[in-house]
Structures are given as C-alpha cells and as structure tokens.
Amino acid sequence: NSAPQVVVRMNRKESAVLAPYVRRLAGQSMASFQKRYRFQLKSPVVIEIYNNHEDFAVRTAGMPGLGLLGVTFGNVLAMDSPSSRAVNEFHWGSTLWHEMAHVYTLESTGHRVPRWLSEGMSVYEEWRTGPIKGISIPGYVYAALAANKALGVAELDRGFIRPEYEQQVQVSYMQAGLVCEFIDRRWGFDKLVTMLGEFGRGADTSAALKTAIGIAPADFDRQFREFLQQEFGTVFAGLKPWSESRRAAMTAASRKDWKTAIASAQSALKILPNDVEDGSPYVPLAQAQYALGENQQGRTTLE
C-alpha cells in the first residue's frame, strides 16, 4: 500500500537545499504517524513554504504581522521557511513535525478533534518522536502551572480560543502536550487513539474520556494535578530562586562582574537546565566565560 506522496511548493531559490529535507522529514513523520494512528491518508500532503513571513501570514489568516510559525488545513500545511525568521527563533524541523501530526489528527477525525487534543498531540509528538526529542517547557509555563492556572481538561479549548491572560495560548499548548503525555504514561498511547476515534464519531471531551479511560473530567483533572506535582514539584519550588539568579546573572554581566555572573547563571541553570528563552542564563554565562578567556567553555555553553 503506497503512502500518498508529498507535494512541496516553495521559492525556487531555496528549493534545491530545502525541498529534499522537507520530503525526507515529511516522509519519516508519515511513516511514523500512519503506524501510530492506524490511519492511512487518502490524498497527498501539500506543504507550502514561504520565505517571507508576511506572505505566509496573509495566506493563512488574511492578515500580516501574525506570530504563528505553521498552519494546517487538513492535508495542506503552510509554514515559514527557515530564512524568513531570525536564526534560533524556532526549530524548523520540529515545526514541520508538529504540523504533520495535525494532518493526521484532523484527517483521522473528519476535522472533529477539539483544538486542545490536536495541539496536545502535536506538541507531544514533537517531544516523543520529533527531530529534537525530550520535553521542553519555558519557565513562564512552569510558573503558570505552579500558580494553578491549568484549565480543566473539558475547558482547555478556552485557553486557545479565548485567552484571559498574556501567554495563556502558549501555556495551553504545553498543558495539552502534558495531558497527552500523562494519558500515555498512565493508560497507554492506544487510549489517545481511542479518544481520536470517539471525537471522530462526534463525542465531546467528557464522553471521549469516559469511553477511553473510564473516568470523568473532574477526576482526570485531580489526577493530572498530582502528575504535575510529581513530575515538576522540584521545579515549581525552585521558580523564585531561578528567577532571582537569572536576573542576577544578567545584572552582573552588564556590570562586567564576571565571577558573579557565572555563579548566578549556574545556580539558575541547576533549576532549569533547558532554559533557552529570552533572558536565558546561558547568554551571560558565555559572555563571562569569553571575557575571562575561557573560550572553550564559552563555545560549549552556546552550543
């Protein structure tokens, strides 16, 4: 049974370098998702890649200035090319993987999957099967989860559609990914596939949970909160010292107090080693190492 092919539409100047990589990565994701979701796509996947972010924004939402990286409409997905954004602004391969997961969750449910599960599965697939594996969560998301800002699973769509505080959409993406991670660990990946099947038949979140894992949303929310505490309790407890050390490292580096910058940055990174957001302690740490002539350490820090 031959897999449907991938059609790539992109700027001719970039296609020689990028198109083979796109086809290979899209093909790998399709081989993986076809097996995992037990679903064969019926038509080719069309991947449109824009080397100008404003063109992409107008094509996908009808307005420039949009902050999205990729958008999926069934078996057509549109995304920025690596050259349309600053270096290090996003990992391009992970974004493609994320969007390809949407193709499967949308198509396999006849587009009935709720936003929270489609986004959750895409984030979860980035972490589990994507080109850069491992759970990666920004500090502000940990802070929101520690402050009990996680929505109940039956309300989670609201966090995407009607956010009530800054960064709630991003927090909801991460929470949805963690909900999928939790279901997989506690009940097994198959239950996520069962839920997709239920949504495809028109069930709501409450009914899909009941069929797949036999519990109501309120009970699920309680167990999910326990899971967060178990997984990230140490990080939650360390958020205040993390934030203080992070700030201290920046301040010390701006004053050229390199010893303090190194000590503070290392304290912050002990708590959140994956902190690569704006204001990351890796920046003052590398600055200090270079300033003290520790060029090899500086290079390692920036990698």
Q: What spans do the regions from the language model cover?
A:
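Substrate-binding/catalytic groove segments of enzymes
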Residues: 132-133, 183-194
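Acidic helix/loop microenvironments that form the catalytic cleft of cell-wall polysaccharide enzymes
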Residues: 119-127, 190-204
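Juxtacatalytic substrate-recognition/specificity segment
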Residues: 2-114, 125-134, 142-150, 154-172, ...
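Alpha-helix N-cap and coil->helix boundary residues
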Residues: 42, 112, 116-117, 190-191, ...
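Active-site catalytic microenvironments for nucleophilic, acid-base chemistry
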Residues: 107, 128, 182-186, 198
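Beta/coil-rich, acidic/histidine-enriched accessory regions frequently appended to metallopeptidases
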Residues: 5-9, 167-171, 197-303
